[in-house]
Amino acid sequence: MAQHDENVVWHAHPVTAAQREQLHGHRGVVLWFTGLSGSGKSTVAGALEEALHQLGVSTYLLDGDNVRHGLCSDLGFSDDDRKENIRRVGEVAKLMVDAGLVVLTAFISPHRAERQMVRDQLGEGRFIEVFVDTPLSVCEARDPKGLYKKARAGELRNFTGIDAVYEAPESPEIHLDGQQLVTNLMAQLLDLLRREDIIKS
């Protein structure tokens, strides 16, 4: 990775993050959904974004598959590539938070160190870790993309939960049971956002 060039300097914006938040009527923050493939991350994040949009909240959803079509299309699934994938997403999320958006991200992000890296990038009070905790057996039974079947057959290497480790969050801001109904999970998330004064009660 290229090193920082001392000739490249940060230019302050005439419009501040606080002014952007005032315009939107809410704080900028990231809800970082993490869990195994098939745990329900994207489904719950998508449902929450729709609910927040209906409440007049300015949102954007960054999905693990979608960013690999463009921003991270040059990356594979080695440990180094996974780390770079998450670093890039964290930087994009940080820009969106600075713009005053509520950003939802749905990434397996299997390593605690990478999730902590993004938390550190964003700063205090800007990162909400959402652990969608679904047993491997349930994820494998769902297998919406047929990836577990391929991994079990040896057609897919470095697949999280099969031959690559998933490090579960130790103290997420919210721990969701991925076997519950999406409506129940969404209600828990909306309650959290109200308690944190990110959206109005």
Swiss-Prot record:
<dbReference type="GO" id="GO:0005524">
    <property type="term" value="F:ATP binding"/>
</dbReference>
<keyword id="KW-0418">Kinase</keyword>
<dbReference type="Pfam" id="PF01583">
    <property type="entry name" value="APS_kinase"/>
</dbReference>
<comment type="similarity">
    <text>Belongs to the APS kinase family.</text>
</comment>
<feature type="active site" description="Phosphoserine intermediate">
    <location>
        <position position="109"/>
    </location>
</feature>
<keyword id="KW-0547">Nucleotide-binding</keyword>
<comment type="function">
    <text>Catalyzes the synthesis of activated sulfate.</text>
</comment>
<dbReference type="GO" id="GO:0070814">
    <property type="term" value="P:hydrogen sulfide biosynthetic process"/>
</dbReference>
<keyword id="KW-0067">ATP-binding</keyword>
<protein>
    <recommendedName>
        <fullName>Adenylyl-sulfate kinase</fullName>
        <ecNumber>2.7.1.25</ecNumber>
    </recommendedName>
</protein>
<dbReference type="InterPro" id="IPR002891">
    <property type="entry name" value="APS_kinase"/>
</dbReference>
<comment type="pathway">
    <text>Sulfur metabolism; hydrogen sulfide biosynthesis; sulfite from sulfate: step 2/3.</text>
</comment>
<dbReference type="GO" id="GO:0000103">
    <property type="term" value="P:sulfate assimilation"/>
</dbReference>
<keyword id="KW-0597">Phosphoprotein</keyword>
<keyword id="KW-0808">Transferase</keyword>
<dbReference type="GO" id="GO:0004020">
    <property type="term" value="F:adenylylsulfate kinase activity"/>
</dbReference>
<feature type="binding site">
    <location>
        <begin position="35"/>
        <end position="42"/>
    </location>
    <ligand>
        <name>ATP</name>
    </ligand>
</feature>
<dbReference type="InterPro" id="IPR027417">
    <property type="entry name" value="P-loop_NTPase"/>
</dbReference>
